[in-house]
Amino acid sequence: MLFIIAVIFVVAVPPATHLLDEEKLQRPIRELQTFARTARRDAMLEDRAYEVLLLNDSYILRPVQKDTGGTASSMRYELPADITFVIKRLSDHDFAKQADARWVFSPNGLCEPLTFLFQRGSDWIRFRVDPLTATLQTEESYIR
């Protein structure tokens, strides 16, 4: 009986570990998707452009300022230390790490079509963001 329990434990633990690893990589992607939806919605509701600043260690969502000197509220998400990402713009041939990239959402709801590659160790998830809906499209992944 003990042998059967040991076998079940050995078989069940690797899939559970795999799910935890995938969740650690999916969390920042879900946050980015939330930022994109919020930026699109707010841009259309307020009839002004919003931007998501894609920094090395975080994302910041804020309205695009027009030299008014005023400060607007913003949302921020800090990436976990072991997760990195790179982006590929429509005109790029390959992914590139950019220290301070801007992703602009116009008042008509459109955004620049970007492809993202998130990595954690040797695990990765790649996806494209639809410029009309700001939703994730064509996702590919490799999780050990």
Feature map (PLM): residue ranges:
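Alpha-helical hydrophobic helix detector
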Residues: M1-P14
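N-terminal helix-rich module
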Residues: V11, P15-T34, R41, L45, ...
